[in-house]
Amino acid sequence: MNILITGCFGFIGFNFLQTCLEDYQDDFNISGIDSLNNPYSKLNHNLVKERNFEFYKEDIKNIMNVDFKNKNFDMIINFAAESHVDTSIYNPALFIDSNILGVNNLLNFCVKNNIDNFIQISTDEVYGSASKDNEFFVESDILNPSSPYSASKASADMICNAYEKTYGINIKKIRPANNYGPFQQPEKLIPFSISNIIKNNEVEIYGDGSNIRHWLYVKDTVSGILKVIEYGKSGEIYNIGSGIYFNNNELALKLLEKFNLDSSSIKYVKDRPGHDFKYAVNFDKLKALGWNPKYEFDLALEETIKWNVENSKWLEENIEQIRKNRKLRFESK
C-alpha cells in the first residue's frame, strides 16, 4: 500500500513514521510531507533522513504543487496540524489556516488524484469538557469545542464528513486523548514541566490545578491508529484512550517525585481562558477491534522523562522563545 503521512515530523506523526519504518516496511510504501516549520520537526527529520522513505518538504496548503512522481497513493494519514491551545488563543487564524483549510486542501487533493482512503487524526477536545465525574464521551456525541484549536479540529471533522458524502472518499476519524511521550514539542505540559525542573524552575500550573486530563502514551496511540487502518470501518470515528486520569496537580507531583521534589516546587499561574475542566472518552469501540493500551503510566512517564533529559540541551536551545510566547502562563494569580 502506498501511503502519504502528513505532518510526519510532528510529535504523533513522527512516532507513527518510526513505527512504520521499523515494523511495516513490507506492508507500506511510505512517503511523508512536512513543512519543517519549527526546530523540533527539523531535529526529527535529521534522525531519519537516511531511512527508506520519500520525504517532501512542503506545507499541506501547497500540496497541489508538489511533484510526487506519480506515486499513486492509496491512503493519506493526516497528522499535520497546529495543536497548542495557548497559541490558538492569541493566534486563531493560524489554526484556521492549517487545521481547516489545510485539511480541505488534502481532501481536494484526494479527489483530484483518485485517492480513496483518508485517515484524519482529530482530538478528544472536540467534545468539549465532561461535566460529570462519570461522563465519558462516545463517538456519536455532539461536538462542543471550547478553544480555537478544538474548534478548528471539529471543523476539520465536519469537512471530512462532507467530502465522504459528496465525493465518496473512505474516511476514518480518530480522536486520541492527551498524548505524552518522546519527541513531544516542548511547549506541551509534560515536557515543559520537565524543562522547568531541569532548570531548577518551578512547575507552573494553570488555575488551581484541578483540571483533569485523560493521559495516553504516544506508542499506544500509534498502535491504535494502526488497528483502525487495518480493521476500522470507513465512515466511522474511533476514540483512543487509556483509562488513566490525573488532574494537573497530581500530574505535577508525579513528575516532581521522579526528581525527588515535592509540591513546594509548584507555582500556580493565571488560568487559561475557556479552560476545559475535564476530557474523558469511552474507547470501547476501538477495543472491539481487538486493541487495548499496553503501557503502564509510571513506566511510560519514566521513558518520557529519560528522553527529555537526554535531549535537554537541544530542547533548551529552542524553548526560550516558547516561554516568551506563552504570555498567559507567566501571569501570577
Locations of the language-model features?
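Short alpha-helical
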Residues: 11, 83, 132, 184, ...
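C-terminal substrate-binding subdomain of Rossmann-fold SDR/epimerase-dehydratase oxidoreductases
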Residues: 15-19, 58-59, 197-333
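A conserved pocket-lining segment of Rossmann-fold NAD(P)-dependent short-chain dehydrogenase/reductase
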Residues: 88, 140-144, 169-182, 193-216, ...
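Conserved active-site region of classical short-chain dehydrogenase/reductase
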Residues: 100-108, 187, 219-222, 226
